[in-house]
């Protein structure tokens, strides 16, 4: 199938992409990648223009998760030796918000490594959110694991705008990656967040040993739930995890996946997330033709390429960062690359404890 622009027209006219059409996209020949991105960009430009939304993550509780997600070095079940610390204090989380604001973030994401939050941890996030909202006109996203209805309402009432809980992969493939909880548990948490009035941030990871059909199944499941934000991560294997020796997905195929996610989710905040620097490498700018958002300043257990290089990438590709004009004066992002080699491992070595996860 080569008439990719007809798919964009179909989507813009209000007819959702079908499963078979989505499969055609992810199975396209490499020669078709630019044509696919052109189709995805028509949809992206219609809903988001050339704007790019910057998100920053705060790893508020690290390395102490009891779950066995095979991709994650923060699990206590693996010999991955992550940095470990308990729940940060309110002041630390608010300080992280200031740093995110100075980096130009429009969304600040508070993340904990856990199955689900204790009531005291929910209280910390709620108080931090209230204080952040008093000063910084940023959206606040929380990612605290599995939620019940009471916890979801409490977070929403405190001003949390969006809740992140990724499905990670298709329902069929999930059991090959996680055994300590069910895919349906994650779906229920996302539904609880939406029922409480928060937007749903929910996506997955490319490269968990799944088939391309699993990418499509995940995208369609997210559409059925009605998520507003879709982070797409790319597995950057972590030492000591069961997936440490898995080959990364080719960048061409990652771009096909992003194009498919954009066509399935035309209005969503589509984010190229963890692993982009390593897996997409020099093809990152092309991803902006489908995605309208990304994280800067690192992830869960890996550093990024530096916000200076990220901003330069946006500008050189002909896009523009979304900047919130109101609020306190912020530091202008530096223009010089603060990781001279552009090496993500070098960024790892200089990563601060507040550097956060993908999601």
Swiss-Prot record:
Cofactor-binding details, from the entry: Binds 1 [4Fe-4S] cluster. The cluster is coordinated with 3 cysteines and an exchangeable S-adenosyl-L-methionine. Binds 1 [2Fe-2S] cluster. The cluster is coordinated with 3 cysteines and 1 arginine.
Keyword Transmembrane helix: no
Listed EC numbers: 2.8.1.6
Radical SAM core domain residues: 47-276
Binding residues annotated for [4Fe-4S] cluster, in chain numbering: 65, 69, 72
Keywords: 2Fe-2S, 4Fe-4S, Biotin biosynthesis, Iron, Iron-sulfur, Metal-binding, S-adenosyl-L-methionine, Transferase
Pfam families found in the cross-reference section: BATS, Radical_SAM
Family membership noted in the UniProt record: Belongs to the radical SAM superfamily. Biotin synthase family.
Protein's job: Catalyzes the conversion of dethiobiotin (DTB) to biotin by the insertion of a sulfur atom into dethiobiotin via a radical-based mechanism.
Protein name as annotated: Biotin synthase
Organism for this UniProt entry: Salinibacter ruber (strain DSM 13855 / M31)
Gene that encodes it: bioB
């Amino acid at each position: 199938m080569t008439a990719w622009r007809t798919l964009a027209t179909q989507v813009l006219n209000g007819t959702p992409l079908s499963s078979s059409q989505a499969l055609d996209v992810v199975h396209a020949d490499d020669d078709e990648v630019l044509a696919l991105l052109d189709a995805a960009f028509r949809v992206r430009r219609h809903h988001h223009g050339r704007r790019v939304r910057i998100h920053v993550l705060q790893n508020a509780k690290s390395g102490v998760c009891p779950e066995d997600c095979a991709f994650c070095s923060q699990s206590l079940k693996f010999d991955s030796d992550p940095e470990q610390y308990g729940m940060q204090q309110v002041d630390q989380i608010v300080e992280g918000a200031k740093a995110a604001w100075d980096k130009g973030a429009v969304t600040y994401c508070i993340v904990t490594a856990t199955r689900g939050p204790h009531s005291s941890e929910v209280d910390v996030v709620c108080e931090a959110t209230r204080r952040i909202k008093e000063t910084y006109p940023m959206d606040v996203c929380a990612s605290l694991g599995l939620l019940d209805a009471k916890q979801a309402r409490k977070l929403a009432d405190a001003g949390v705008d969006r809740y992140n809980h990724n499905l990670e992969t298709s329902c069929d493939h999930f059991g090959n990656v996680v055994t300590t909880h069910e895919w349906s548990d994650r779906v229920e948490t996302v539904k609880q967040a939406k029922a409480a009035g928060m937007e749903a941030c929910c996506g997955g990871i490319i490269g968990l040993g799944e088939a391309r059909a699993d990418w499509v199944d995940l995208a369609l499941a997210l559409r059925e739930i009605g998520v507003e934000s879709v982070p797409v991560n790319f597995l950057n294997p972590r030492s000591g995890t069961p997936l440490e020796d898995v080959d990364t997905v080719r960048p061409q195929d990652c771009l096909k996946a992003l194009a498919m996610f954009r066509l399935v989710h035309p209005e969503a905040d589509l984010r190229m997330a963890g692993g982009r620097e390593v897996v997409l490498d020099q093809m990152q700018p092309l991803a902006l033709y489908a995605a309208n958002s990304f994280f800067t300043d690192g992830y869960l257990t890996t550093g990024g390429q530096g916000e200076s290089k990220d901003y330069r990438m946006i500008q050189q590709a002909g896009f523009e960062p979304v900047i919130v004009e109101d609020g306190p004066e912020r530091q202008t992002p530096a223009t010089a690359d603060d990781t001279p080699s552009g090496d993500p491992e070098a960024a790892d070595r200089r990563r601060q404890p507040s550097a956060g996860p993908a999601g």
